[in-house]
Amino acid sequence: MIAMPVRMQQGSEGDGGGPSRGTSVITRTKPKTKKPSLYRVLLLNDDYTPMEFVIHILERFFQKNREEATVIMLHVHNHGVGECGVFTYEVAETKVTQVMDFARQHQHPLQCVMEKK
């Protein structure tokens, strides 16, 4: 909240148009905006999806370069799950849907999920 003192002009207020000697305070309130919740998009390991396909997914849908995609893919392979990125709800939901649809089109059982950070 911001408070600013304001001097009143002569004849603008008072008793019948005479000079006013008071001051008024005008307050402006800024609405508090809440940052949107963030969601992690995760790939889950399976025994059937080729590693090269996972790298392609990371490059295509998450704009990872070859090196970053390979590191994430190996993490998924070795640990069972890996983070592709952190996004707002709508973006994360869209990415999960895109990955799942693309994997199904290519007949791979790859799973992609999102969880609140």
From Swiss-Prot:
GO biological process: protein catabolic process; proteolysis
Domain of life: Bacteria
Gene3D superfamilies associated with the record: 3.30.1390.10
Transmembrane segments: none
A UniProt-annotated Pfam family: ClpS
InterPro entries recorded: ClpS (IPR022935), ClpS_core (IPR003769), Ribosomal_bL12_C/ClpS-like (IPR014719)
Positions of region (Disordered): 1-33
Similarity section: Belongs to the ClpS family.
Protein role: Involved in the modulation of the specificity of the ClpAP-mediated ATP-dependent protein degradation.
Assembly with partners or alone: Binds to the N-terminal domain of the chaperone ClpA.
Protein name (record): ATP-dependent Clp protease adapter protein ClpS 1
Lineage of producing organism: Bacteria, Pseudomonadati, Pseudomonadota, Alphaproteobacteria, Hyphomicrobiales
